[in-house]
């Protein structure tokens, strides 16, 4: 039925999803015991891998936040609390747990659910995303507005270490450091955006000291780094943060592509998948697709650079996506 299982050696199947079958919204998730959550995460990965390899979509980033997403919805109430996913391509598990499980056959298709959080799609999508480094500013604005209305609920931003290098994220951290807003920023540190990260922030996160670091210098409470796939650690840290009403940073370390070995080994290649990639028999070799704009740009720039040594390429933090890797 699913040729990609044979092609990729996929062993997951959806015959028995004892826990996930009974979860239609976060209220069902909250009925589970802590001990049942690891099994639920296994079932979520099986479901997600099956559906996305069949239908296409953002892949490895979502596998890296399964445990985090489950625990967030287990502890907080996002009908009241607020949650913003930076970029948003890692929000598929969030969608799965918030009443959109049956829509995964039509994800990113006409009439189906979007591949990013979308405000008019669900009451659980609090901010429309799709671009990098906007989450902290957005959640801080919501939290400041809530303070004016005397609403004490939690405001959470999940931002990757790659997105943390964007200028808007620094502007937001600058403001957050002097705010009393009820904000939790979760740094999802997986060492990679679409391509491996670089720069001073990347180095700082790799060598960070819990007592003395960039975030504490800004006046922010910091915890971490903790294992973002360890359910007990996540529950402990997030339950503790729930009772704190001032800005906090929680630094977690995750593996992009967690639970699917090909994606763990080739994280850039498995950032997203398409059905043609999954099943080569479906590709139309008689009518090949035209070259992508970025590929034309990358190869043209290379040709020009070979003739003019003064040309320097500046990548937008993703040499693969911009096709500047050819340089």
Language-model segments: residues:
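Cofactor-binding active-site loop characterized by glycine-rich and histidine/acidic residues
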Residues: 58-179, 293, 303-327
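Flexible loop/turn segments at secondary-structure boundaries
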Residues: 91-93, 164-166, 191-195, 222, ...
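Conserved thiamine diphosphate
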Residues: 149-153, 199-237
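N-terminal amphipathic, basic-rich helices that act as targeting or association modules
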Residues: 16-97, 216, 225-234, 248-251
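Terminal amphipathic helices with adjacent charged low-complexity linkers/tails
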Residues: 229-284
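Cofactor-pocket helix-loop regions in the catalytic cores of large enzyme subunits
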Residues: 41, 45-48, 57-65, 215, ...
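Mobile "lid/hinge" segments at catalytic clefts and subdomain interfaces of large enzymes
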Residues: 165, 172, 177-202
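Gly-rich Lys/Arg/Thr-decorated short loops/hinges at beta-loop-alpha junctions or inter-strand turns
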Residues: 19-25, 46-51, 114-126, 155, ...
């Amino acid at each position: 039925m699913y040729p990609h299982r044979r092609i990729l050696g996929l062993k997951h199947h959806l015959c028995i999803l004892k826990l996930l079958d009974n979860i239609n919204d976060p209220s069902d998730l909250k009925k589970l015991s802590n001990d049942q959550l690891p099994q639920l995460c296994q079932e979520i990965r099986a479901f997600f891998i099956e559906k996305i390899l069949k239908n296409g979509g953002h892949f490895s980033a979502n596998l890296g936040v399964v445990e985090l997403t489950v625990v967030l919805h287990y502890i907080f109430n996002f009908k009241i609390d607020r949650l913003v996913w930076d970029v948003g391509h890692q929000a598929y598990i969030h969608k799965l747990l918030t009443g959109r499980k049956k829509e995964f056959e039509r994800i990113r298709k006409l009439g189906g659910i979007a591949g990013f959080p979308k405000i008019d799609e669900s009451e659980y999508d609090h901010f429309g995303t799709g671009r990098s480094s906007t989450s902290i500013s957005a959640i801080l604005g919501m939290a400041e507005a809530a303070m004016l209305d005397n609403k004490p609920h939690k405001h959470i931003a999940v931002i990757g270490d790659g997105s943390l290098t964007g200028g808007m994220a620094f502007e937001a951290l600058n403001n957050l450091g002097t705010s009393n807003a009820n904000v939790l920023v979760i740094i999802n540190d997986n060492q990679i955006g679409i391509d491996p990260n670089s720069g001073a922030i990347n180095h700082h996160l790799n060598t960070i000291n819990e007592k003395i670091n960039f975030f504490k210098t800004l006046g922010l409470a910091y915890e971490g780094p903790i294992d973002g796939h360890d359910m007990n650690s996540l529950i402990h840290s997030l339950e503790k943060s729930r009772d704190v009403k001032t800005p906090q940073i929680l630094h977690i370390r995750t593996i992009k592509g967690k639970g699917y070995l090909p994606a763990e080994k080739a994280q850039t290649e498995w950032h997203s998948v398409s059905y043609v990639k999954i099943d080569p028999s479906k590709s139309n070799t008689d009518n090949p697709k035209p070259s992508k704009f970025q590929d034309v740009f990358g190869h043209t720039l290379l040709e020009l650079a070979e003739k003019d040594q003064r040309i320097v390429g500046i990548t937008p933090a993703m040499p693969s996506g911009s096709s500047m890797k050819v340089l």
